[in-house]
């Protein structure tokens, strides 16, 4: 039976609390690493080696592709082979060196995923430069901070981003002297650059700088830093996470070993759609894996509305996503089902129940119902291009109802992973066809050790019958520290263990369930501790809520919340309950607010929340929390200090009116 399976084994015993240090649970490792962690392929010690050996093995394979635009219309994907890309990388590297850039200097890359992004990155890898992605989603303030903090001397920039980059001047020009466009440069931009003290080149212009010149490539050591990835963080300035060659080589080795053990190996036939930001370690790590096996990377056009069309043209076999993207896929499919008539919906429901039932009995998604796949679910598969064999979700937890739905209807392996920039992405991953792993992030990948550390102030006990505690990671994927912030490094890196700040719970089969966030805890006026992330997960079960931010502080005795209602669900309720007006006015309606508050309270009681954990007032916000207002990080985590600043007046008013109504006994 599946419940008897266990996918981890113990490598070190648990330790009781001593000298003020909390207790820690046993150290566990993936059963795929019974004979030790997998070793990298001979000759691969750096990111450059990953690319160089792929060029040697697969010179004529398609490597990088984009859609050709003719008369404003997108055509087929046009490809560059591994050898063609290599030749451009060498030229670009020669140009870098010819304008005085030396090993160890910092090179910024700013823009949407494209061929030039990867080529610039590989040129950095070739010459031992630190590749510093400049976040496309963070705005000029953060870009300016990163350029100055990392001391970026040259930046490769998407054409459209040149004006944004200029906004960082004059502060950034203390370090940044050269800018290279991924495309062309307008004459007025040349003039502006000159005034700012910058030299700016078009892509073709820059490639010519190194013509006829050759430079010896430096030796790259495993411990050398290859990239500094700045994490937006939910508080304060971005932190520069230093990632070594060894970290990336270790993660690619671990991913290959893991996929090989679950019969989902990557190969040179694989095609990957590149649309998640290369500035994030999730996409960077996956693309390194694709390059290592000689696979193909096709780039989207940069517009989420055109993503499905790009998928249809590219027909990828590997599709990585963040939960928000898969949520949209799920919602879109549900809407189509609702609008397709009673008969179609009934056929779908019967097929879904039948196939899901067989999968629960232990059948693989392929064997569970080939008939239903062909007749009912094939349209879903075609919607993703028709060839997808792996969907991998990462960056945030994927709701289990969406994961189970996709495992049935997408006709492919649906996996969920967990990792941090500091752990170079993958740390846990679910298995194909193991439904016991639904709602978890799976067991550890076979290149890390994991243990839980008790969090007494939150009543999480790593030695309890159901072990819960802060997830701690050990292994060669871990980062080399925060750039210029040894103080912050020491806070999270203790005795070789990375303290993630995430609270997890071991499942009987060795999977990990993320249940809370250690730092998102505060005390109410009466002295009760509130683990706010856990509460938000509970309140998010309310169907009419899309997103919710729960707030409290040590001066108040109760909680309030700002909620983004689900528009269609609330509008449907409004029609049924005689509430008129558009979505904005419905959100301001007292009857709608009372309805949603009632649903939140009902859910709180169903989940046996304590009295002080029940929300006393809610404000309905029609505009979803977004990055444009700096309320979310690029991985869609809530920026709590910024939310408080933005909604300060609303929060103040909610506390005032709720206290008045409580005082009057209403």
UniProtKB/Swiss-Prot annotation:
Keywords: ATP-binding, Fatty acid metabolism, Ligase, Lipid metabolism, Magnesium, Nucleotide-binding
GO molecular function: ATP binding; long-chain fatty acid-CoA ligase activity
BP term (GO), one: fatty acid metabolic process
Region (Fatty acid-binding): 495-519
EC number(s) stated in the UniProt entry for this protein: 6.2.1.3
Family: Belongs to the ATP-dependent AMP-binding enzyme family.
Described function: Activation of long-chain fatty acids for both synthesis of cellular lipids, and degradation via beta-oxidation. Preferentially uses palmitate, palmitoleate, oleate and linoleate.
Protein name from the UniProt record: Long chain acyl-CoA synthetase 5
Species: Arabidopsis thaliana
